[in-house]
UniProtKB/Swiss-Prot annotation:
This is Archaeal Lon protease. Homohexamer. Organized in a ring with a central cavity. SUPFAM superfamilies: P-loop containing nucleoside triphosphate hydrolases, Ribosomal protein S5 domain 2-like. Belongs to the peptidase S16 family. Archaeal LonB subfamily. It is found in: Cell membrane.
Amino acid sequence: MKTTIKNSRTQESVSYEGNETKKGTGETLSYETSKDIEVPERLIDQIIGQEEAVETIKKAAEQRRNVLLIGEPGVGKSMLAKAMAELLPREQLQDILVYPNIEDPNNPLIGAVPAGEGRKIVMNHKNKARSQDEKKNLFMMLIISFILVLGFMMNQFLAAIIAAGIIFLALQQFRPRTTVMVPKLLVNNEGRQVAPFVDATGAHAGALLGDVRHDPYQSGGLGTPAHERVEAGMIHKANKGVLYIDEIGTMKMKTQQELLTAMQEKRYSITGQSETSSGAMVRSQAVPCDFVLVASGNLQVLEGMHPALRSRIRGYGYEVFMKDTMPDTPENRDKLVQFVAQEVEKDGRIPHFSREAVEEIIREAQRRAGKKDSLTLKLRELGGLVRAAGDIAKSRGAELVETEDVIEAKKLSRTLEQQIADRYIVQKKKYSVFKSEGGEVGRVNGLAIIGDRSGIILPIAAEAAPAQSKEEGRIIATGKLGEIAREAVQNVSALIKKYTGTDISNYDIHIQFLQAYDGVEGDSASVSVATAVISALEEIPVDQSVALTGSLSIRGDVLPVGGVTGKIEAAAEAGIRKVLIPASNMGDVMIEKKYEDMVEIVPVETLGDVLEHALIGKGKESLIQRMQKISDIVPSIMKKPAMH
């Protein structure tokens, strides 16, 4: 995409070359379909674009270090944790048994044996108990038979039957319970070839740390022995393996403290987690829980983490910040080809992709990166697009997913924000909240982003009225503005003084973000606000077929903003014919082909460039000439610093 404009200050033609959506993918892999791509067996080799994190995980696995992974959702944090379980050194896994304690029933004993031996021990104890029961049953049957035979011989049939029944009940009542001596298999690692991986995300204290069942419905009846009511926690099941906790900062502080204790001691006793239950009276011996903790979350999670827990991870492990984009190189595009093949293999219900369909997925990865020369690493969302395209191809009975299926899948798998944005544009246009033709004083079509990349039209109106205060005028902005947005509006006053030469101390300038009920945050509307205010002060109409976005410095330079692709596409959907964006954002533009002929994209460097393209009417030329004179005068009258 190549766009040429004239710089309003120098009158020189300046060309800008942006990323083309038609840009060749240039993969080094040779393939016809994704079926030709070999999918690695090891999970660690399936992780895309996180080379630094992978190297850290390998070191952590080799030395059994804890890891804290911080990053955006969908960049591969849980996959890294699972891969670490495969990489852990092969150790002797253990089965954990809990035995009854004859001396103190509320303090069950704990035993650890090699994996696979636990079930054998339990079966041996059960067989012994069963053998004892059979002997006792045989003895009881002999006694009852003797009584019955004796009664028949003495012609006392009824008395013999009654006596046999009484003896049977008595023997049952006073029969010693040998079955209570059978241990319970708490953790079973039989047949496991790799270290256990336990996902404890969202687990409550009982599930994480272990618990003791305390009511008849849970424990199996009144009088159930204490050791049979003991339940292992996830920290015990992760012994010699990996315990993964996502969004660890949402966990209660008390639970984090107990988790820290388990990490330090590598053993943790199981007790009832409810203080008001009978299970709280039971406390087992310390149960082995020698696990590697892999915690994850976003940056906000750090605020909710216990300082000592984070210190433990940092002191005995690593902190890793995950990338959300990777450079757009042939090697990295090859990795996305591998990613498509992996997703097809994992799903198992969708057909493979043709080469052209894979290239369309790569182009979408470029768009979703949101910046030039980059590919997105939010692969969970990209995987959703792969599966949606596969579903479409499957529904039409195709053997391969083609480019048309991927394009159709983009519509099918739109995010909630994108669907809301589409309806927002239709509704606002229907009721003329924003306009896409004609000219109007003090009214500008700004552009904004909701969610990650869904653009919307943000109409802004400005009006200049005589100041109510005798001392000075004010800038009054409405529309639930956030802190950054309020500061951006305040900065506009300096630009108005510089570019118009107007003394605004005699005016109250009112700025309204029309129907912005959900609030406005960020400074990407600075250009729009400045244009609306200057239009209102000078009474020069703004072209309503133009939409604009960009941040402003107090010197009038247009600074880059995020989400330009989504904003441009939203403007095109709304019928806008020209969009002004910061010149430094031109490389980030990756709009869909269908929008290329619908809208003209104009890069701007200064507020003067913006006004030249946004304003219309007879007063425009005189304003721009006056602005140029003021811009030339201001530097010349500035005092030079004194030389000593």
